[in-house]
Amino acid sequence: MGVDHESAGTVDRTPERRLPTGVARGGVIADARLETLCRYWLERCGGRAMPRRADIDPVAIPAAIWPHVMILEVVREGAKIRFRYRRAGGVFWRAGGAEPTGRFIEEVLPATAGYLDYVVAIYTEMTEAGRPMYSENFFTRDGQGVPMRTRRVSLPLSNDGAVVDTILAGHVFEYPRERDTAFPVVDGLREAVRVYIDETAPN
């Protein structure tokens, strides 16, 4: 997989860095678990633009990755798109402090520093484009002052092959060690990377 360097969003659209290579080459997604999930999604495409929800077999996803996996239902209410958790791995609900299954995203994520709007914008963009996406952001809340980094893949699923009705997502949360210079000092939210994953690029 290669990378389309098109980016969008409402929160600090200037990326911290651009990653030059693709998933199949091992260069874009900076976490092996998320890369494995992307490879699985591509295999399940079977030559189509995106897999169906029924094509995703939990047994086929390695056990080490499953705690990082979420499945979200895309709910269309007229022109509005909402996202409801249908499955959330333990890593996610432990980070959020509650099990979110069955709840809408706005009932779970904090609105602090525009974080809820940021995540909704990522899922909305990916849903409308019908293309897999990788993103990274730094976030602090409640005056903590020490940022958490989130690495995220958002992968579209569609029962009719055209309209995205489900999202297969993977999240990895990283917490800095004391004086870890890899984590910038930020106040609130900062996006580092947002790129489409080009699944048609050669290996």
Task: Indicate residue ranges for each PLM-predicted region.
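Helix-loop-helix
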Residues: 113-116
